[in-house]
């Protein structure tokens, strides 16, 4: 589960770089939203993974 959160976090980072860099100006807002959603998912999964140990 932590692996999937990390994969989605990396995808969100790539989308954010493309969106914030002006390459896809129309998609910048979507990239921002996805970035924050996946940061939250990553942190929740990280906490759950540490709590299970």
UniProtKB/Swiss-Prot annotation:
<protein>
    <recommendedName>
        <fullName>UPF0391 membrane protein BURPS668_A3117</fullName>
    </recommendedName>
</protein>
<keyword id="KW-1003">Cell membrane</keyword>
<dbReference type="GO" id="GO:0005886">
    <property type="term" value="C:plasma membrane"/>
</dbReference>
<feature type="transmembrane region" description="Helical">
    <location>
        <begin position="30"/>
        <end position="50"/>
    </location>
</feature>
<keyword id="KW-0472">Membrane</keyword>
<keyword id="KW-0812">Transmembrane</keyword>
<dbReference type="Pfam" id="PF07043">
    <property type="entry name" value="DUF1328"/>
</dbReference>
<comment type="similarity">
    <text>Belongs to the UPF0391 family.</text>
</comment>
<feature type="transmembrane region" description="Helical">
    <location>
        <begin position="5"/>
        <end position="25"/>
    </location>
</feature>
<dbReference type="InterPro" id="IPR009760">
    <property type="entry name" value="DUF1328"/>
</dbReference>
<keyword id="KW-1133">Transmembrane helix</keyword>
